[in-house]
Amino acid sequence: LEVFTHPQAGLQKPLLDADTQRALAGELNAPDPGARAVAVSLLGRLGDGVQTDLIVGALQDADWRVRLAALQALIDQGHPEAAGATITMLEDSAPQVRSLAARSISRLGTDYAESLAAILEDPDPGVRAVAATGVGGIRAQKTLDRMLESDSPADQEAALRALASHPDLTELDLVRFAGHPDRRVRAAAAAALAPLAGSGPAIRSLLDDGSVIVRRASAAALAQRADGPALFMDVLANGSVRATEAALQSLADTGQTGEGLTEWASQEVARAAFLRRHRLALATSDSSATRTVLATLLASRQERLLRWALLATTTPHTADMMTVVGRGLRSADQETRAQAVEALESVGVHAVTRSLIPLLEETGHGALPDSRTSLRELSEDHDEWIRALAVRCITEELIDDLGHLRGLADADQSGLVQSAIARWEVIAVQDTQTLDTVDRVVALQRVPMFAGIDPEDLERIATLFTERRYDAGELIFAWGAEGDEMLIIVEGEVTVSRPQEGAEVPIRTVRSGDYVGELSLLRGQPRAADVTAGPEGVRGLILRGAQLHAILEERPEAAMAMLATLAERLGTDWNR
């Protein structure tokens, strides 16, 4: 009743009753600093001002987290004592507390500038940078310029973050920091460049950065600029996958829409339908390892394009609905897909909806082409990896055909048949001695830990491997030996065994498309088993420990897949 009869409309700030206030006051003496910090924070947010003495007392707490919460509580309350207490906290031992105090004072106006001038030489770069923005003028410029010219990435990052909101405090060229080796400095540079004229191309280049935090910072910076929409559209037309992802997410977060964006989304859906059609065509014939990788690539490209199209038509108001629409479009149930299309139509993206129809039909638009026709069309695609895999599939078919011709030449002595075959005798198919880039990527995509990684990224990862061959029966890894290598099996198989009472006890056989030796790498312990090449020998790719750890750190999905395989193997070995 009190809620509905309150004279002031809208949400009301809840007030502490006496019992709750006593409970929170008691928590200020709790042994856990986390509990004390929460208590003082609640007193600041929910209190009516009479708890100020308790909050001021918490500024003397031994734990910096409690002091930080107490200072924030005073600032939020806007209490008359807040300014004096904040100035006192500029001398706190914790940089987090000093930084909050400096930020608060910098908002109070020039009357407090001299208080901040005293900490322009603070040991913490974040505190110095915040103090400089509050002091302003030539002293601030000298402080920030010194930080930018220092060799410390922490100094440079802090100065750049301060300049994002105070670009007038330096005359130095900030574009050079877009190429800094430290990703945090590059991210801060993107924010600092946002308000500067002529910096659009430099910020745009950071959309393709290898670090996700830099890409996000770059997209956020472009979204603030007048030329941001034009630069985003240029990225969608010509940018890399990473740049496109960052641009689309920023457009969705900021709610930017337009006819050009809708047209682009329609084209992406049409492209997805084209890829799906060829994927279905390839599924009608026998599948080699390369065809399997090509089909997987077509499916992942199709999924990516559909996701991009939905993201391009998403606004903050429709984000939740678009998530549901996306699930519906991917459903195996035809009725669910139809309902998803209707939902998409209801938000007014008619061009995208029309483009979706061929993508959702059972066989696309019209009859499917035969697999050879599909491969020929895909061999002329604008996507480099689709072309490469299609050409490799065609090459493999030609090799099979030539093998068939040679068999005919040996079996059929008809002069007419021999004459027909003779023109092909000049073509010699040689067994490649080393694996090329396509071979390596195809081999890696057969391995579960790499199956979810795009060929473009696998192309770089493949350079970390060393190719090796092992003869039949050759010992690859020895029980008890130190191990800093794992083996991806490309051709052949290996036997994993353990010596026991003078004999080798087989544990399992590992075939092509799998790997061995990873456990010793991960644990840093000697080999727990012998690994021996099978009767046909082994062709494989060796990966050293440092490279494996780098891959797992960069690609969490590879780490999860490796853990799943490891758990399965340990379970199998335990049952033995």
Segment roles from a protein language model:
Residues 17-21, 52, 83, 113, ...:
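Core helices of alpha-solenoid repeat scaffolds
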Residues 505-564, 568-571:
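Cyclic-nucleotide recognition modules
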